[in-house]
A protein has these predicted regions:
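C-terminal helical "tail/cap" subdomain of flavin- and related membrane-associated enzymes
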Residues: 1, 62-65, 77-89, 280-285, ...
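Glycine-rich FAD pyrophosphate-binding loop
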Residues: 20-39
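Conserved N-terminal glycine-rich FAD pyrophosphate-binding loop of Rossmann-like flavoproteins
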Residues: 33-52
Length: 409
């Protein structure tokens, strides 16, 4: 059997590696010319995603991932703050949480290594369909084409392959625009370092303004303490933050800015919405080059609406099918689990039923991940309603007082 994979992001590379290990002939075609010259911050891999990965890549690659990953169990519980910097509550203890955060570039580079010379870079797919003999075929912008027994679209949220199968887009804008950046903890004032601690957190204010802070330290909090195996992009305690606003003319104007101009405009926008300066220091201290905008796209959270096509010899996985906003940190993990499931089925079930079973399981998995990710999105959008804004403002002092009282006990 020969499998053609379109897209060498996280899901496509995980699939390529798994098929190669299983002895299946596979070729992964990716439009980027360098897997490291790509955007992205950190990816969270929970226990099931790590378990899936350990079946897809060789043990030495798993070890290098663990040596480059930041362990959640070494972090303090997540915090919820208000826009004045008051603590409203804490999340659960993380000491038994097996999840890790890893730089997207590091994860992608390690997966690319696992795929080896079955990865073909600089190949832009421009069309997909069936040849006269019924074999699936992919066409590229350089005039070449390739056929296989199975074509898998792992080409992300704007997937060409899934659009061919579904007859249209498989997701839509979720109503929120995100702006991310990277801030070294060493660039924060002593006061702010003490206030934030070694924890991730979320601030949600009225009018749909929210700020996520993700703490990672792949060196100090390494999952596996093997410095000789380490290859993270992040080399010290760092906050990867995501500012979120409802999609509007204001965010449209922000999206046109870059670097320090965007960073300053984000701070100004939060200040207009009543946020205290100390809460915004993490944005002000960010590496200007790291600040970038991205739009949240989401597929349906109803399983029956995902992969709305009959099973055949062309399929898709990951964001191509269940594009997931980053609010639950589960999109990449779901793509990896899709890949592991497809590899397993292709090894034990003949082709048409293998794809049918794979797509049925992926619908359930995708819907579960989307349900988790859309909770925070809906909450943030609710604060942009008159009732939601009033409730957010009224609840903050009550929750802050309750948190102080619990702290005193
Ligand atoms: C640049 C980038 C940065 C990201 N940063 C983060 C992040 O910081 N945190 C986070 O949680 N998630 C991030 N994500 C999303 C996360 O990586 C995905 O949600 C998740 O990995 C799902 O994996 P996937 O393989 O389905 O899609 P992706 O990882 O998006 O991979 C899709 C791949 O297909 C390729 N492709 C698309 N169209 C074609 C074509 N026509 N021909 C050939 N190749 C094509 C793309 O170049 C891409 O490499 C990012 C995604 C991208 C593309």
């Amino acid at each position: 059997m020969r499998v053609v994979v379109v897209g060498g992001g996280i899901g496509g590379l995980a699939l390529g590696s798994g098929l190669r290990r299983a002895g299946v002939e596979v070729s992964v075609f990716e439009r980027d010319t360098d897997v490291r010259a790509t955007g992205g911050y950190h990816i969270t891999l929970d226990g099931p995603a790590q378990e899936a990965l350990s079946g897809l890549v060789a043990p030495e690659i798993v070890e290098r991932m663990l040596a480059s990953g930041s362990a959640l169990r070494l972090r303090d519980p997540d915090a919820f703050w208000d826009r004045r910097g008051r603590v409203l509550g804490y999340g659960p203890e993380l000491r038994d949480d097996p999840s890790l955060d890893i730089d997207r570039i590091t994860l992608r580079a390690l997966l690319a290594e696992a795929v080896g010379d079955d990865l073909h870079l600089g190949k832009v797919a421009t069309g997909v369909g069936y040849a006269g003999d019924g074999a699936p075929v992919v066409w590229f912008d350089d005039g070449t084409s390739v056929t296989g027994d199975l074509v898998v679209g792992a080409d992300g949220a704007h997937s060409l392959v899934a659009r061919f199968l579904a007859g249209g887009p498989t997701n839509a804008p979720a109503g929120i625009v995100g702006f991310s950046g990277r801030t070294s903890v060493n660039d924060l004032s002593a006061g702010e370092r003490a206030r934030l601690g070694t924890r991730s957190g979320l601030v949600v204010g009225p009018h749909g303004a929210a700020l996520y802070l993700g703490f990672l330290d792949p060196v100090g909090n390494a999952v596996l303490d093997r410095p000789e195996l380490r290859s993270p992009v992040t080399t010290g305690p760092t906050f990867i933050w995501g500012a979120m606003f409802p999609d509007s003319a204001v965010t449209g104007a922000l999206r046109k800015l870059r670097g320090s101009a965007l960073r300053a405009a984000l701070v100004a926008r939060f200040r207009e919405l009543g946020w205290r300066p100390e809460v915004l220091e993490v944005i002000e201290a960010a590496d200007a080059e790291s600040v970038a905008a991205f739009r949240f796209n989401a597929a349906s959270s109803r399983a029956g609406e995902l992969a709305p096509w009959p099973a055949g010899r062309i399929t898709a996985l990951g964001d191509a099918v269940h594009a997931t906003p980053p609010t639950a940190g589960m999109g990449a993990g779901a793509a990896i689990r899709d890949a592991a499931d497809l590899v397993e089925r292709l090894g034990s079930v003949p082709l048409p039923p293998a794809v049918e079973g794979f797509e049925a399981a992926m619908r359930e998995r995708g819907a579960a991940v989307l349900t988790a990710a859309m909770g925070p999105v809906r909450w943030i959008l609710f604060t942009d309603t008159v009732a939601g804004a009033a409730l957010t403002v009224a609840a903050a002092p009550v929750l802050a007082a309750a948190a102080r009282w619990r702290g005193r006990r």
